[in-house]
A protein has these predicted regions:
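Active-site-proximal loop/turn and secondary-structure-junction residues that shape catalytic pockets
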Residues: 67-69, 90-91, 111-113, 132-134, ...
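Short acidic, glycine/serine/threonine-rich loops at helix termini
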Residues: 73-74, 97, 117-122, 139-142, ...
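Charged (often Lys/Glu-rich) extended helix/loop segments that serve as interaction or gating elements
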Residues: 268, 274-277, 282-431
C-alpha cells in the first residue's frame, strides 16, 4: 500500500484508519472525501517536532490553508501546535470559526484589497506577508488609522528553480509573487518597509515551489536569503528575526515516487542555516515553514461509484465514475498523477487497461489514463488515493453538480465534517 494507514480487510475491501471504505460509501454516499485524522495529526507532529528539535526557539510550521480548508480542520491544527497560512478573508473566517487563534494566522496574497486588509486587521490577524510596495503603503495607512503597529514579513523571490511543475514553481524571478532580489528591487522594498512607522518588519518570506523531495533547493534559497539579509544589515542595521521558507516538500502519489524524509530534510536545512549564519556572524533567525500538501494529501482519499464501462474497439476502455473534475480538477489542469484502486475488489486481478473518466460534459474530465483495474461492474467502488490536498479546496459546481461530503476518520470512528451540497445550495445565491 502507498501509505501505512491503508489496508485490505477479509472482504477484500480497502480500509482507511481501520474503517471499511465500502461501508463508508454506503453510510455517507459517494463521491466522498475521506480524511484520516490520525494520519493528519501524525503529519503535523512530524513537522512540529522536527522544527522544535533542530531550529531556534520560536520556529514552527504554518499549515497552508489553500491545500485544505474547512472549519473542523482548524481545532486539530491548533491542538497539534501548528500556525496557519491564510490567503483570503474566507480562509481567515473559516479558521476563526474553527476556534483558531488569530495571532497564529499569517495573511498572504499578492492582491489584498482594502476590504481584505481591514477585515484581517479588525480580526487581529497576527502577521501579514507583504507582496509589493503598494501593499506596504496601504498596510501602513490602515494600521495608523487603527492605532496599531502591524507585524509583517516581506516576500522576496530568490530566483530558485526547484525543477517542479511550472504551474507550482514560485521562486523564479519572473513570478507574480513577491519582489525579486536579483534585480535590486527587493533592497528598495526593504528600505520602503523600514521607513513605515506603523509596521514592524520581522524578516523575510520566500516560497520556491511545490513537490520538492530534498533539502537542497531550500538550502540554496537560504544562501541567497542570508546574503540578502547581510546586505540589509549593512545598509540599514536591520537584523531579520524570522525567515519563512514557505512550503514545498512533496508527497508520494505513485509507488514509484520517492519517499520524502521530512525530519531529515529539516535537520539538513537547520545545519545549513547555522553554518551560513556562523560564516556571516549573523544571528540565527527562527524559521517558519508552510507545509500544506505534505500535511493533508496522504491523509485523504476520494471514493467514487462506477457508472458506465465503455470499450472502444481498437482504442481503449473507459470506466466512468459519479464525480470527476468538479471534485478533483488537478488531472484536467496539469495531468497530476494519482493512484486509483478498486476499493470494493482489492484482491481481484487487475487485467483491464483503462482510463477513468468523470461525469462532466467535458472531454478533459479524466481522473487517470492507462491504468490497470479489474473488469469493473456498475456500482463498484473506486478509491483515488492521496487526495487530501487541492481537491476539496479546488472543487467547483461545474455542470451544476453538488460538491461531495467530507468525512473525518478518527480512532476507528467516522464523523461527517462537511455535508454534501444539495440542489437548494446550488440556487441559494441566485436572485
Amino acid at each position: 500500500m502507498l501509505y501505512d494507514n491503508l489496508a485490505v480487510n477479509e472482504q477484500g475491501h480497502l480500509t482507511v484508519g481501520g474503517l471499511d471504505t465500502v461501508a463508508l460509501a454506503e453510510e455517507f454516499g459517494a463521491p466522498l472525501y475521506v480524511l484520516d485524522e490520525d494520519k493528519l495529526r501524525e503529519n503535523c507532529r512530524t513537522y512540529v517536532q522536527a522544527l522544535r528539535e533542530n531550529m531556534p526557539e520560536g520556529s514552527y510550521p504554518l499549515f497552508a490553508g489553500k491545500a485544505l480548508c474547512f472549519k473542523g480542520l482548524y481545532p486539530v491544527l491548533n491542538e497539534e501546535g501548528m500556525g496557519a497560512d491564510v490567503v483570503s478573508p474566507g480562509e481567515i473566517y473559516t479558521a476563526l470559526a474553527g476556534g483558531f487563534p488569530a495571532e497564529k494566522l499569517y495573511f498572504h496574497g499578492n492582491n489584498k484589497t482594502d476590504e481584505d486588509i481591514a477585515y484581517a486587521m479588525d480580526s487581529h490577524v497576527g502577521c501579514f506577508i507583504v507582496d509589493n510596495h503598494q501593499e506596504l503603503a496601504r498596510l501602513d495607512e490602515a494600521a495608523g488609522v487603527r492605532g496599531i503597529r502591524q507585524r509583517v514579513l516581506l516576500r522576496v523571490t530568490p530566483g530558485i528553480d526547484p525543477h517542479t511543475l511550472q504551474a507550482i514553481n514560485t521562486g523564479r524571478i519572473d513570478c507574480q509573487f513577491g519582489v525579486p532580489i536579483e534585480t535590486g528591487q527587493a533592497a528598495r522594498f526593504v528600505a520602503d518597509a523600514l521607513s513605515r512607522k506603523n509596521l514592524i518588519v520581522e524578516g523575510f518570506h520566500s516560497h520556491i515551489g511545490s513537490q520538492i523531495f530534498e533539502a537542497e533547493p531550500f538550502c540554496d534559497a537560504v544562501d541567497i536569503l542570508l546574503d540578502f539579509a547581510q546586505a540589509m544589515r549593512q545598509a540599514h542595521g536591520f537584523v531579520a528575526e524570522t525567515l519563512n521558507l514557505g512550503g514545498g516538500f512533496g508527497v508520494r502519489y505513485l509507488e514509484s515516487d520517492p519517499v520524502v524524509d521530512i525530519p531529515g530534510n529539516i535537520r539538513a536545512l537547520a545545519e545549513h542555516l547555522r553554518q551560513g549564519c556562523a560564516e556571516k556572524d549573523y544571528p540565527v533567525p527562527k524559521v517558519l515553514l508552510e507545509p500544506g500538501r505534505s500535511i493533508v494529501a496522504n491523509a485523504g482519499l476520494t471514493l467514487y461509484r462506477v457508472g458506465g464501462i465503455k470499450t472502444i474497439e481498437g482504442y481503449r476502455s473507459y470506466v466512468t465514475v459519479n464525480g470527476g473534475m468538479t471534485d478533483n480538477p488537478r488531472y484536467a489542469l496539469y495531468k497530476a498523477p494519482y493512484t486509483v484502486v478498486p476499493a470494493s475488489r482489492m484482491n481481484d486481478a487487475r487485467d483491464l487497461s483503462c482510463t477513468v473518466a468523470g461525469r462532466c460534459c467535458e472531454s478533459g474530465d479524466l481522473i487517470q489514463e492507462n491504468i490497470q483495474l479489474p473488469e469493473m461492474q456498475r456500482d463498484d467502488l473506486l478509491a483515488v488515493l492521496t487526495t487530501g490536498a487541492y481537491n476539496f479546496t479546488m472543487a467547483s459546481n461545474y455542470n451544476r453538480l453538488c460538491r461531495p461530503a467530507l468525512v473525518m476518520v478518527h480512532h476507528g470512528r467516522a464523523r461527517l465534517a462537511v455535508r454534501r451540497q444539495t440542489f437548494a445550495d446550488l440556487v441559494a445565491c441566485d436572485l
